[in-house]
Regions:
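Bacterial Sec-dependent N-terminal signal peptides
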Residues: 1-22
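Catalytic cores of phosphodiester-bond hydrolases, prominently lipid phosphodiesterases
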Residues: 19-358
Length: 358
């Protein structure tokens, strides 16, 4: 009798039993919650208080922090964001100006990692420089270690910003510009520290098709089974920076990262439309065509401060596969009940656009 009852309930509740992603589900039919600026630690209170006096509005927008990348993955998040600054010679970011602005802060970079050449990971030079992994190589090594300890994990999307904008303040560090040669080093860093077997690249998705976009429109994304244990990197940048990455690599041939390319471009595969409420119908249209879309549940701490989930609700309805938040856990910086997860409390599910229930 119990077995019959179980079968009856399963039949009545397809959303629970029959609509979960299976191994043959293409990865563009998944919906995932992830984090924004996933490496970020809080600005030291002494410095934050000083900066807040000068510009309280801007500082409120960056008043958040995250647990380690491994801990986020352990919770079930499958989209992380890592920002990188090029530092070819090393030492460019070894002594942030903020250390001198507010004396008495905890020691910074005690291991001397910032003096070594290579990509550095933090939010804003000289101001918001505390991070859970100081170098890109360390971030990648942490991802690999976690992945190999959980070899059957669902695919993880890594969104990246290539940071090179100067601060409009005298004396602040001027970042190196990202050029095709610097991007070559970025690709090499990923390959050296993660290895091809842990990656899904544009070449993998393009397959036999002439362009990446043609493959995407023919639903040539790998299945969940094929994507397990792997990472997909996305360069979320402006058109000029994206074009620098594409130079010499039409349709991203031989490149490691996907880019935020406009539909109609040979490189189009993953699109970034961050305003889920205003762009809901556009997002849904792109998702139905085969593109993967990243959007945001919240930004600048605004939704969390007012406990406003309307953007998150729009993001879920839109079918955007990647939904970014700063609040997979409640804020510890201000009082709020705002927290983002799917109705079942998880961060991974079948995309409602492709759900059997729809």
């Amino acid at each position: 009798m119990k077995n019959l009852l179980s079968i009856f309930l399963i039949t009545l509740l397809p959303g629970i039993a029959n609509d979960a992603p299976g191994d043959n589900t293409p990865i563009n039919h998944l919906q995932i919650i992830g984090s924004h600026n996933s490496y970020k630690r809080a600005i030291d209170p002494k410095l934050f208080k000083l900066l807040q006096k000068a510009d309280s509005i801007s500082m409120s927008k960056i008043d958040y922090e995250h647990i380690s990348l491994s801990e986020q993955l352990g919770l079930g998040l499958r989209n992380l964001e890592i920002d990188v600054y090029a530092d070819t010679a090393g030492g460019k970011y070894a002594h942030p100006k903020g250390l001198d602005m507010a004396p008495g802060q905890p020691a910074y970079d005690t291991e001397g990692l910032m003096n070594k050449p290579g990509f550095k990971v933090f939010h804003i030079q000289d101001i918001d420089y505390r991070t859970n992994c100081a170098t890109f190589a360390l971030c990648l090594q942490e991802l690999k270690k976690w992945s190999e300890a959980h070899p059957n994990h669902s695919p993880v999307f890594i969104t990246m910003n290539a940071k090179d904008e100067p601060m409009k303040r005298p004396g602040f560090t001027i970042p190196d510009k990202f050029t095709p040669a610097i991007y070559d080093k970025l690709d090499k860093e990923i390959l050296d520290n993660l290895g091809p077997k842990h990656l899904i690249t544009p070449d993998d998705v393009r397959g036999k098709y002439q362009t990446l976009e043609q493959a995407v429109l023919k639903n040539n994304w790998p299945t969940l089974k094929q994507a397990r244990g792997r990472f997909i990197f996305l360069l979320d940048e402006t058109a000029p920076k994206n074009l620098e990455y594409v130079k010499g690599h039409p349709s991203l041939k031989g490149r490691v990262l996907f880019i935020n390319a406009e539909p109609g471009m040979p490189e189009a595969a993953i699109c970034v439309l961050n305003n889920a409420k205003k762009q809901l119908s556009e997002i849904t249209s792109l998702v139905k065509k085969g593109y993967i879309v990243r959007t945001r549940a919240d930004s600048d701490t605004e939704e969390a401060r007012t406990n406003d989930k309307s953007s998150f609700e729009a993001a879920m309805r839109s079918g955007a596969q990647l939904i970014s938040t700063d609040y997979y856990k409640k804020s510890t910086h201000f009082k709020s009940d705002y927290v983002v997860s799917f109705p079942d409390g998880g961060y991974f599910r079948m995309d409602p656009v492709f759900s059997k229930k729809n």
